[in-house]
């Protein structure tokens, strides 16, 4: 990361896409996409997804590292080209507890990530806990971030410390996506970004972390990009020029969250304006979902009824029976809920792919389709971009390859934005 940031600060047009997903097919696609390049791939886990207690994936940071490395070995991607990051590391998971208890767990969270070899650490203590004021004072946020940084430094080996980088600050949306419809978004003001940096510098120095300050490579701000279930707020470069000019006076770049669904031109403009770390998550699993839905429609027409996976029906049954991951995000009317479950840009379905019933139905569908020849006309109908690549010899009509290429479509846009 340090080399990439240095190149960007030296005037090169270069950025990096941060892949925020724990889905094995998404991680496989991210690694396979850059297998034949010289680029490093940044893969991040969030604190609610992966933590010392397992998170919602059931994985600790060390488990997640081995999970990613196993996929890399399968793909033939060198482990040393992977950068592992931890996103929103702080009291995010424990906001219902008092601050002392939540911070105690947050300290252990950060230590677990660093011990596991994660080198990009987002120190985010911006969330109010049960006995806190709302919102937290910037000084309190910075002091808690310094406590987390001290925890990271205390367990890092000399070798790890050379690679260790920190990201500070937070964006407006909650981690995981907006819960309500959005019409506009508040762009971070320069004075707020400057205050974030100033308060963190003061808090770090007060705890003897002056050297660690040199490892702060980025600050999270809101550049004016966001999405909800059915709306996308697109980057307006002219609105972010004050931010772009301010960061040029520092040694840092910006990290932009929720950049999913922007245009490839917007990604290029974001990187030009020093939002050099672009985080993406739901757009990748949304592409995966589109591919699986397309293949399910193809299966419906090619496979005898008694052998079909019933993939789409199983997904809906499970999500309606177990609504905990979507009910506070989508409208409650039955038809609206079904539309949200299937097609929401927030892609809450991503939390359900590991469910045994859904996983088994997808596997059955894949086996069914691997045993037949999919007519080109059907691929043109349901996966038109992949049809074009089959025609040009870039792709084969194999279900797994079709899914990979659908995810590559998202990564292609980020490559256009980030490439030197």
Swiss-Prot record:
It comes from the Bacteria. One of its GO terms (cellular component) is plasma membrane. Keywords: Galactitol metabolism. InterPro entries: Aldolase_TIM (IPR013785), GatZ/KbaZ-like (IPR012062), GatZ_KbaZ_carbometab (IPR050303), TagBP_ald_GatZ (IPR023436). It holds the Pfam family GatZ_KbaZ-like. Pathway: Carbohydrate metabolism; D-tagatose 6-phosphate degradation; D-glyceraldehyde 3-phosphate and glycerone phosphate from D-tagatose 6-phosphate: step 2/2. Transmembrane segments: none annotated. One of its GO terms (biological process) is phosphoenolpyruvate-dependent sugar phosphotransferase system. Forms a complex with GatY. NCBIfam families: agaZ_gatZ (TIGR02810), PRK15052.1 (NF011626). Belongs to the GatZ/KbaZ family. GatZ subfamily. Component of the tagatose-1,6-bisphosphate aldolase GatYZ that is required for full activity and stability of the Y subunit. Could have a chaperone-like function for the proper and stable folding of GatY. When expressed alone, GatZ does not show any aldolase activity. Is involved in the catabolism of galactitol. HAMAP family: Tagatose_aldol_GatZ. This is D-tagatose-1,6-bisphosphate aldolase subunit GatZ. The gene is gatZ.
């Amino acid at each position: 990361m340090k080399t990439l940031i240095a190149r960007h600060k030296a005037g090169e047009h270069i950025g990096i896409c941060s892949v925020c997903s724990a889905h094995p097919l998404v991680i496989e696609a991210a690694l396979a996409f850059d297998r034949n390049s010289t680029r490093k791939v940044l893969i991040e886990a969030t604190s609610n997804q992966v933590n010392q207690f397992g998170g919602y994936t059931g994985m600790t940071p060390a488990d997640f590292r081995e999970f990613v490395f196993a996929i890399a070995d399968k793909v033939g991607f060198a482990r040393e080209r992977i950068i592992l990051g931890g996103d929103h590391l702080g009291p995010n998971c424990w906001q219902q507890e008092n601050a002392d208890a939540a911070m105690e767990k947050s300290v252990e969270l950060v230590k677990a990530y660093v011990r596991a070899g994660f080198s990009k650490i987002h120190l985010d203590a911006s969330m109010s806990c049960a006995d806190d004021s709302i919102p937290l004072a910037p000084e309190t946020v910075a002091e808690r971030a310094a406590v987390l940084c001290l925890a990271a430094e205390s367990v890092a080996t000399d070798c790890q410390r050379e690679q260790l980088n920190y990201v500070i600050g937070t964006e407006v949306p909650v981690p995981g996506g907006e819960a309500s419809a959005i019409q506009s978004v508040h762009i971070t003001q320069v004075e707020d970004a400057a205050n974030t940096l100033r308060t963190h510098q003061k808090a770090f120095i007060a705890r003897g972390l002056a050297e660690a300050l040199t490892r702060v490579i980025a600050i999270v701000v809101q550049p004016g990009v966001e999405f909800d279930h059915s709306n996308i707020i697109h980057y307006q470069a002219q609105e972010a020029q004050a931010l772009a000019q301010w960061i040029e006076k520092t040694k840092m770049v910006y990290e932009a969250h929720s950049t999913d669904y922007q245009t490839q031109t917007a990604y290029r403009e974001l990187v030009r304006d020093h939002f050099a770390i672009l985080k993406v998550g739901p757009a990748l699993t949304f592409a995966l979902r589109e591919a699986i839905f397309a293949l399910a429609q193809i299966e419906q027409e090619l496979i005898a009824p008694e052998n079909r996976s019933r993939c789409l029906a199983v997904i809906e049954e499970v999500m309606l029976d177990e609504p905990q991951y979507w009910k506070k995000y989508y409208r409650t009317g039955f038809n609206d809920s079904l539309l949200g479950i299937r097609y929401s840009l927030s892609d809450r379905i991503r939390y359900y792919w590991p469910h045994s019933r859904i996983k088994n139905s997808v596997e059955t569908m894949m086996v069914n389709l691997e045993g037949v020849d999919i007519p080109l006309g059907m691929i043109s109908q349901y996966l038109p971009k992949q049809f074009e690549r089959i025609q040009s010899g870039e792709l084969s009509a194999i279900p797994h390859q079709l899914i990979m290429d659908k995810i590559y479509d998202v990564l292609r846009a980020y490559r256009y934005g980030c490439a030197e």
